[in-house]
């Protein structure tokens, strides 16, 4: 299930009732500010979905409309460009990763997409903390081009959460000592049955 609203979370009268009725082994949740200059609507609201993949992005590509978007559009297969409904840098990053997923596994698709972004952006900055899931695994990055990426934390068995739960979050949600800062240029791979995998990007 995917639930999106383009309104501030505190104005969403349905959220409390909805949240109390949800039960799952894996959740992705995002609360984001709108990007100045881009339309506010469902089409620009995360998480984005393609088939069984969900995608979220914390960051930006500077001057995306002038630099990133035209270059990414030259690369994308028609199938993935046609699936784009909004105009955010986030949705184009997702499409670029999906483009490379056609011939790679997800880890390699992320590496390939970030490598291409490094090439096409030149001296422009980009903050690329992304999270993807197919319902079985979560892939999360802390990464930046010509900048310092937003924070990312991993926590296991954190007080106040379900026993044996694992969390990947942008900000530590408590003063617990169980939170670990994820280093810059890292990819985390989390699954239900395996140990957390951390790879350098």
What does each model-found stretch correspond to?
Residues 1-54, 62-201:
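Conserved short alpha-helical segments that host acidic/polar catalytic motifs at enzyme active sites
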């Amino acid at each position: 299930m995917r639930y999106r609203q383009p309104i501030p979370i505190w104005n969403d009268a349905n959220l409390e009732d909805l949240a109390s009725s949800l039960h799952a082994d894996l959740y992705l949740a995002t609360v984001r500010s709108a990007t100045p200059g881009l339309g506010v609507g469902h089409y620009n609201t995360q998480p984005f979905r393609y088939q069984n993949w969900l995608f979220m992005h914390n960051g930006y590509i500077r001057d995306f409309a002038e630099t990133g978007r035209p270059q990414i559009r030259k690369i994308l297969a028609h199938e993935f460009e046609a699936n784009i409904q909004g105009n955010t840098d986030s949705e184009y990053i997702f499409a670029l990763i999906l483009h490379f997923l056609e011939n790679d596994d997800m880890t390699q698709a992320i590496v390939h997409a970030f490598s291409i972004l490094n090439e096409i952006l030149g001296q422009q900055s980009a903050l690329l903390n992304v999270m993807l899931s197919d319902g079985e695994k979560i892939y999360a990055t802390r990464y930046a081009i010509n900048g310092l990426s937003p924070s990312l934390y991993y926590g296991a068995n954190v007080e106040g959460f379900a026993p044996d739960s694992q969390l990947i979050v942008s900000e530590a949600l408590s003063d617990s000592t169980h939170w670990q800062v994820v280093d810059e240029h890292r990819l985390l791979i989390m699954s239900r049955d395996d140990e957390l995998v951390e790879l350098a990007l």
